[in-house]
Each structure stands twice: as C-alpha cells, then as structure tokens.
C-alpha cells in the first residue's frame, strides 16, 4: 500500500467518523442488552484448578466438557449484537484428583488482525441499521479495497464445536472451521484455520 492510499483512507475515516457522530445525535439509540446481565463479556483468559477427592468424578475422569459462544474482545457498545462476538471456548477437564477450567478466545484471522490494530475493524451485524449502517458499509468496503482487511477469514468461530475423527473444530456459518488442540496438560490452543484451495467461504 502506498502513501497516497493511506492518506485517502485516513481522510475518509476522519470524515466518516465525524458524520457518524453527528448522525447518531438524531438517530435512534440502539439497545445494549447483549452486553449486560448474563451477556456481559468475559474480559480475560483464565485457567483455574480445583483439587478434589470425590470418587464420583472417577466415572468421568479424563473427559472434557466444553462449549463455545460469542464473547467480544473489541466492541461497539451501542450497535453490538450477540451474533457479532468473537468465539470463546470454555472447557472443564476432570480427573481423579482435580478439575481444571480454562477459557480461550479462538484465534481467528479476524481477531488476530483486530488485536494487531487494538480496535474493532470488521463490520458487525448489529451495525446494519439506518444512516450509520450505510456509512459503516462504505467504510468497511474501502478498508477491503485498500487492503486493510483481507477477503478471507472474516468469521468469528463462535457458533458450535464439532468433534470429528478425533479432531476438534470451532465453527461459524460464514467461514471455514478452525481446528483446536487440547494438550496433555489441558491447555487449549487454536491450531489452524482449515484451507482447501478449491473451496471458499
């Protein structure tokens, strides 16, 4: 990307941001219910270990209970919708002496890029409303055009988990699956985004 493209992009961001601020003064204020009460995002990745001597857990030792859901890392408070959050896996591992809990963000291409810029970059479902929605679409289209956002890897991997052929995947309808790895110490990591040369999502 050359300097002229960067100048054009930054100028557009400045002008569109000013317009959006003005337009929000006369537009409807949208709900924030998906960021409150039981929907409050988890802000940190944690590992918690609880020792136990309960023999009831022997029946399920070396098993894992896991779920995945929407948990935004960078969020627009006003326009956020729970479809938009980054995928986060919550897992509990059992053995005969301890229970281990761990939560991890799925390291999607989308999240990695936003972590690099330390801000929200992608277009959110909840933003597609009114004048502000049109401006966000225009801004997002220019970011794609100038190469700030790649044409692939836009999914959040926040919809479901699939265990298939001894492999664990995080799924999202709008993107390829992300393969996860759980090692012998119950450390959850994102292994890779599946890629097939003749298949696009």
Where are each of the predicted segments found?
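Cleavable N-terminal signal peptides of Sec/SRP-targeted secreted and luminal proteins
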Residues: 4-16
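Beta-propeller domains
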Residues: 19-201
């Amino acid at each position: 990307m050359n300097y002229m493209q960067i100048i054009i992009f930054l100028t557009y961001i400045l002008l569109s941001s000013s317009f959006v601020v003005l337009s929000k003064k006369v537009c409807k204020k949208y709900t924030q219910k998906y960021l409150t009460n039981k929907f409050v995002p988890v802000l940190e990745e944690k590992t918690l270990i609880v020792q136990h001597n309960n023999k009831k857990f022997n029946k399920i030792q070396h098993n894992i209970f896991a779920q995945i859901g929407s948990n935004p890392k960078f969020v627009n408070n006003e326009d956020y919708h729970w479809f938009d959050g980054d995928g986060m896996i919550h897992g509990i591992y059992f053995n005969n002496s301890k229970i281990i809990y761990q939560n991890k963000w799925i390291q999607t291409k989308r999240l990695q890029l936003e972590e690099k810029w330390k801000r929200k970059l992608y277009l959110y479902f909840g933003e597609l409303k009114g004048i502000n929605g049109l401006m966000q679409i225009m801004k997002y289209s220019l970011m794609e055009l100038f190469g700030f956002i790649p044409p692939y890897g836009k999914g959040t991997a926040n919809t479901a988990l699939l265990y298939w052929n001894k492999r664990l995947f995080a799924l999202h309808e709008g993107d390829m699956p992300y393969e996860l790895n759980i090692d012998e110490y119950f450390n959850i990591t994102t292994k890779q985004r599946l890629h097939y040369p003749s298949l696009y999502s």
